[in-house]
Amino acid sequence: MAFPVDLLDNCTHEELENSSEDYLSSLRCGDPEHPECFSSLNITIPVSLSNVGFVPLYGGNQTQKILALFAPEDSLTAVALYLVGQWWAIDDIVKTSEPSREGLKQVSTLGERVVLYVLNRIIYRKQEMERNEIPFLCHSSTDYAKILWKKGEAVGFYSVKPTGSLCASFLTQNYQLPVLDTMFIRKKYRGKDLGLHMLEDFVDSFTEDALGLRYPLSSLMYTASKQYFEKYPGDHELLWEVEGVGHWHQRVPVTRALQREAIKATDVSQYEATRPVSGEYGLAAVPEHEPGLDDTQSSELQIHSLKDAFASTSEGPEKTPVSTRTRSSHLKRPKIGKHFQDSEFSSSQGEDENVAKTSPTASVNKIEYAARTSESSEEFLEEEPEQGVIDFEDESGDKDAQPALETQPRLQKQDGDKDSALEPVNGEVMDAALKPSLTTEDEDSTSEGLEEDLKVPPFNSSGEPGNPVPLVAESSKVPEATLAKTSPDTDSEMLIDQSPSDDKGHTEENLSPVSKKKTLLGSSDNVATVSNIEKSDGNFPNSVVPEFPEEPVSQNLSPNTTSSVEDQGEEGAPEAQEPSATQSSLIEVELEDAPFPQNAGQKSQSEEQSEASSEHLEQFTQSAEKAVDSSSEEIEVEVPVVDRRNLRRKAKGHKGPGKKKAKLT
């Protein structure tokens, strides 16, 4: 029986394609209810237009095609080819009836090209290719190839890219040496040294000094090369593993490639030996890792470190290494209007001063405690109004002297003098302070009045007088010295008190420290005296003055703003002695708006402001007398002694231009 390879010896591509076109035309005209069937290996496949088509014989070249029949379940695998006027099964196409076709025969006829196509494209790629192998491309019509025939059947092939042939990967480059491109042997014929036979035929077919094998080496090429070098050890420099077209930088000796593959095979065998068998997990290859206990310990340490890393990310913000400055509550600015319960104000005074330096509005909240204290003691307003005014007068004098005492070395000498009472001395001072005829004094008498007023001994908590010092002769000078310090405050506070009358009740409750000052200015004569003294005392250097510019206070300021004015005084003397809770708020009032050295224009301006503000004093005098007695019995003051000589010397050294002495009638 003749097979297609035998029948196609004298056939051309055109004749084969024309016969295929004629059959396809007859198939279109056939009866669809009674189709032709093809039987192979006990399988019957109906032939119809839906499962037949042309396939290229040389891969990318679409000019030479053959008609193929596909299985219904696999439309990409041909089960038969239409050759010589009939359908031929794949197994029949690779057979021959010619006894002369034995061994390796070079492909030359159309039938042999069809056999090469079937071996490469159908048998190898669809049936026998391994997973780790790379499929071969379809051979062209001019490729050098040989088919291995064995007992009337094609069992394998190999193909070569001769020197000078065009490289498919590099379209403009040609091969520099003959390269063994493909090699294939069917599985049922492997193990009979057929690969070695093909390699020996390749070496004998080309006479070049260097021959190449396609990179990467297939398993068949690797086995054949190994057998070849065992049989011919002198040809180590003949065979090269070639990549690309085979330049010198693209070739490696096959012996080195064999060593590389041997190392890979050893690693794979060790892995296979150590890999647990199915059903016996955890029992394989444990003793091999026991000698190196350090490896297991290091792996455990890595696991623990990973656990710690994951735990640190889930424990919370307290262990997070990021800065929490913006989250800390003590660094946030308190909002205006928020009330702090400063029951222990003296213990937290240092912290409040630091916050007040960076945020002046934060001091508003600290004075509200004193305001609420004055509200709680409203019941004492009608009982001792005059005595409350006297208390505030001595307190203001005390507070004027206190910042100056920070630079005096005699501060420790006053610890034992705390036995005098406040009431009898203040009564005498009040009698003199309320006299309507106050005369202006020169700058020397003003400083003398201040110094002699500071000699009042401190009072103890029991309220009993120790060694009272009579101040009757100097009663007219005490309010002058006191008002000289507080005249800038008084001017600004007169503007505060010009708020609408509906807020008057609220002002009387919350601004008791301010009202205490207003009672000292009983008439316009007092204001004139204050303005003159203010000019002389404007350059007084011994008082600790915070660097805040004087600004006019608006008439609509709230009581909280007045409290902030009082609070800023505390910032000017952060190193002063720590007062009690009720005294600290009053100290802040005296130090806040102490003026800078004034020129002539500024002094005249302040004098005009004091004269304008005196018009509003009388209408608030009665309300102030009711509010001045807030916490009069609760306030305990210390009046430390200031060095008189230093105060007088500094006061005289900073005198302004001379003023005419005038009596105000």
UniProtKB/Swiss-Prot annotation:
Keyword Transcription carried by entry: no
Phosphoprotein found in the keyword field: yes
Membrane topology: Peripheral membrane protein
GO cellular component: nuclear inner membrane
Ranges annotated as biased composition (Acidic residues): 376-397, 440-451
Lineage top rank: taxon: Eukaryota
Stretches the record annotates as Disordered: 309-665
Entry keywords, A to Z: Membrane, Nucleus, Phosphoprotein
Compositionally biased tracts (Polar residues): 311-326, 521-533, 553-566
Bias (Basic residues): 327-338, 646-665
Phosphoserine: residues carrying this PTM: S348, S377, S447, S512, S610, S613, S630
Subcellular compartments: Nucleus envelope; Nucleus inner membrane
Composition skew (Basic and acidic residues), residue ranges: 412-421
Family of this protein: Belongs to the FAM169 family.
UniProt protein name: Soluble lamin-associated protein of 75 kDa
Organism field: Mus musculus
Lineage start: Eukaryota, Metazoa, Chordata, Craniata, Vertebrata
